[in-house]
Amino acid sequence: MEETLRALSESLNALTNVVTGIKEDIKKNNDRLAILEQERGNADPTVDQPQPLVRARTEYELREISVLPDCVKELQAFEGRQEAYLSWINRAQSILTEYDLIKTRPLYRAIVLHIRQKIRGHADMALAAYGVQDDDWDDIKRVLALHYADKRDLRTLEHELGAMCQGSRPLDRFYMDVNGHLSLILNNLKARNHPREVVNALIETYRDKALDVFIRGVGRDCSKHLLVRSPKNLPEAYSFCMGLQNVMSRNFTAQNYQPSGAPRFAGPYQHQARPPFRTPFSPGSGRFSQNSYRTQGPRQAIKMESNRSGQSYQSGYSGRQEEGSGIKRMSEGNNPFQKAQRLYHMELAPPPLAPAASGDNQGRSHEGYYDDESQAVERSNNYPPQKNVEGVTDAPHNLETEGGANFMTNASPVYRT
C-alpha cells in the first residue's frame, strides 16, 4: 500500500509540474498578444499596407494583358497643368475602381502601367525625381497631389465662392469660374473621412450656394429674369442666361431704322483681346501728366540768304548791312521818311556855252566828258539823295532822260530851285 501511495504522489507531482509549465506558456503567449494588439491599435486603420501587384508569368496572362480596355486607351494625357489635375485624377481613379476586383491579376498591373504612361511633361519629371515606382498607384497619387492639388482649405474656398461676381467677364467665363470653384469644394469634401450621408448633405448645400452666387453675381438684366425663373441647378441657370442673352443681342445686331440708344450690355462671346494700356506710375509725377498740355513755343526761324544773282555787289550793299545788323528793312512805299525825291519843283537852266576846242583837243575833251557823265549816272542810281550844306537836296536824276540835249556840250546841266 505504501508503495502504491508513493507512486501516486509522484505522478501527481509530475502532473502538477506539467500544469505549471503550461500556465507559464499561456501567460507568455497572452503577454505577446497584448503587445501586438497595442501596436496594431496605435497604427492608422485607414492606411492599408501596399501590396505588390502580380506580374504575368504564363503565356495566357501575357495574352490577356495585351488587350487593354478602351476606357484606359482613351484616357487623356496629364502634362502638369494645375487646372486639369482634378478632372484627370478623378477619371483615372474611377477606371481603377471599376477593375478593383482583379487587383490580384496581371491585367490590373497592366492598366496601372498604361495610366502611368499618360503622365508626361513636368508631372513625369516630378515622379522621376521622387523615385516613384510605375506600378505603385497610391504613391503616384501622393506625389501628384503634393505638386498640383489645391492647398486651400474648405473655409477659404467657401469665402472666395461667396465673393465672386461677373464684372467685366463674359458669361461663359463667369460660369466656368463658379463651376470650377464648386468642383474644388466638392473634391475637398470627398477627401474627408465623413459619413456618406453627411458628405451628400454638404454637397447639396454647396451646390445651392453656388447657384445663388451665380444668380446674384450675373448681370442685372439676367439676374432679374433668373429670380423669376428660379432654376434648380447651376447648368439650368447658365443655359437660360445664354438663351436670354442671345435673344436680347438681336435688337442691336439686326437692321433697325428706329433711333435707339446704346446697348445695355455687350453681346455674347465678346471679350477684350488685349488689356488696356496704362501708363506706369511715377512717384514724382502728379495724377495726370502735364506734358501733353504744355503750350509749345514757336519754332526757331530759319535765316534765308539773299539772292545776289540779279544785282551787283555795290547795289546790294545796303541790304547786306541791314541783314548783319538785325534791322528789318521796310519798303520805300510804306516808309514816308525815305521816299524818293521828286523833281517837280525844279526847272532846268540852260548850261553856259563853252569855247569850242580845235583839233585833237576837241575830241579828247568830249571823251573825258562822256567818262565823267557815266560815272555820275552810276553814282546817282546807286546812292540815296543827300543834303548839302545849304539844305538843298541833291536828288538822283537820270542824265540820259533829263539832260539828253546837253550831252554834246562840255558843261553839265544846272538845276535851280
UniProtKB/Swiss-Prot annotation:
Transmembrane segments: none annotated. This is Retrovirus-related Gag polyprotein from transposon opus. Residues 258-333, 350-417 are annotated as: Disordered. It is found in: Virion. Residues 320-331 have a biased composition (Basic and acidic residues). GO terms for cellular component: nucleus. Residues 308-319 have a biased composition (Low complexity). It comes from Drosophila melanogaster (Fruit fly). It comes from the Eukaryota. One of its GO terms (biological process) is DNA transposition. The keyword Cell membrane does not apply. Residues 287-298, 407-417 have a biased composition (Polar residues). The keyword Coiled coil does not apply. Keywords: Transposable element, Virion.
